[in-house]
């Protein structure tokens, strides 16, 4: 595990255990100034130091190293190309993934999923017409504590094409891909993301299943009673199950090489189902089933776009949070400082999004610290 920045959360949990800076300094064999710097976010803390504190003071390592903190080399891809014809005339002048879903651009939702998985190096695949708009919105990702790269998709030739276009970016790393119009909500999602990261590091691919009423329209996975994948099919006339394969995938290193071996389907595309089938045939495909308590939206139609916006609004108003907020996730992960969070909040302080960021920076006591960790979770 890499050294990490824990910052304010470290201080809040230390105080909740009634520990002084001197106590922690003595336990780690460092000077008090080192603890001051850790709490200011200007000094990283190593895994060995965290484990030592865990044993001495009964502090769960997960309190510091949650799924969102980057402790792996998995890279991420957001596929944000396509023409969005199902949303015409809305998308005749802009990318589908830049259309608002309640209070934020659609692409914030898949971006937040990757960030929640601890992925900091992300490639955004766009059309040539829309790339400038994405760069204007997201820039290089520094404001979220991440590194954003961009590549143009010359033509929409199938989802698996993303791994060929991103081959240089991916290199020898495992990789996750999420579709730019997919939204996920569920309190246990972070655990499923962590499992998928671990699977990828161990050489396994992971696909996410969700029960639907019209499986014949989608890619489908057939599973047994233990959620083992038995087969995958692309829009079958007679589906073997009603579990759709959603637009979130994790793959081990080498995925680009496998993608290049896929032959185009009858409709001339490099199907993601064909890629998944390659892993299945080698007993390297696992499933993550999103059951009760989860919601998945493919926001490619008028009705699904409205449904997603209404759901996000209801959740945010009832819980006084902002769902899929990249700034909050970055802050919780220790990727940006409190000062950077406040700066972002001040830029948008005239609306509820900016006010949320400012409120987030003001959480002080132990109970509020625990809320801080969960405010932007799914």
Q: What do these predicted regions represent?
A:
Residues 134-135, 139-225, 250-253, 259-262:
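Conserved beta-loop-beta/alpha segment of the NTase-like Rossmann-fold superfamily
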Residues 15, 26, 55:
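Alpha-helical residues within the helix-turn-helix
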Residues 1-16:
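A short, Lys/Arg-rich alpha-helix, primarily the initiator
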Residues 69-138, 146-148, 153-155, 189-191:
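N-terminal glycine-rich phosphate-binding loop and ensuing alpha1 helix
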Residues 176, 190, 197-198, 228-328, ...:
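Catalytic-core segments of class I nucleotidyltransferases/pyrophosphorylases
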Residues 46-63:
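DNA major-groove recognition helix of helix-turn-helix/homeodomain DNA-binding modules
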Residues 18-37:
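Short alpha-helical DNA-recognition segment
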């Amino acid at each position: 595990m890499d050294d990490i920045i824990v910052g304010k959360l470290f201080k809040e949990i230390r105080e909740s255990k009634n520990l002084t800076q001197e106590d922690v300094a003595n336990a780690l064999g460092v000077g008090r100034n080192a603890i001051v710097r850790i709490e200011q976010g200007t000094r990283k803390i190593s895994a060995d130091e965290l484990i030592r504190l865990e044993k001495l003071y009964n502090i769960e390592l997960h309190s510091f190293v949650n799924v969102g903190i980057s402790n792996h080399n998995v890279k991420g891809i957001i596929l944000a190309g396509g023409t969005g014809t199902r949303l015409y005339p809305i998308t005749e002048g802009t990318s589908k993934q830049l259309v608002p879903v309640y209070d934020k651009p659609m692409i914030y939702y898949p971006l937040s999923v990757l960030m929640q998985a601890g992925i900091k190096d992300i490639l955004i695949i766009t059309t040539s017409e829309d790339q400038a708009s994405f760069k204007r919105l997201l820039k290089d990702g520094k404001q979220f504590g991440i590194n954003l790269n961009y590549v143009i998709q010359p033509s929409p030739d199938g989802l698996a094409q993303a791994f060929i276009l991103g081959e240089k970016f991916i290199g020898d790393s495992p990789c996750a891909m999420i579709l730019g119009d997919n939204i996920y909500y569920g309190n246990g999602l972070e655990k499923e993301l962590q499992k998928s990261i671990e699977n990828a590091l161990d050489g396994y691919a992971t696909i996410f299943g969700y029960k639907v009423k019209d499986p014949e329209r989608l890619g489908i996975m057939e599973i047994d009673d233990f959620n083992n994948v038995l087969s995958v099919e692309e829009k079958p006339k007679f589906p073997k199950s009603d579990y759709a394969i959603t637009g979130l995938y994790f793959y081990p290193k080498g995925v680009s090489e496998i993608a290049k071996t896929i032959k185009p389907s009858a409709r001339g595309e490099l199907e993601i189902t064909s890629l998944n089938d390659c892993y299945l045939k080698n007993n390297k495909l696992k499933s993550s089933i999103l059951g009760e308590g989860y919601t998945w939206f493919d926001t490619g139609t008028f009705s699904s776009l409205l449904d997603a916006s209404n759901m996000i609004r209801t959740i945010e108003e009832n819980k006084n949070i902002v769902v899929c907020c990249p700034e909050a996730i970055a802050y919780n992960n220790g990727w940006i400082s409190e000062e950077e969070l406040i700066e972002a909040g001040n830029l948008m302080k005239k609306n509820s999004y900016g006010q949320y960021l400012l409120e987030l920076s003001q959480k002080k006591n132990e109970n509020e610290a625990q809320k801080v960790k969960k405010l932007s979770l799914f």
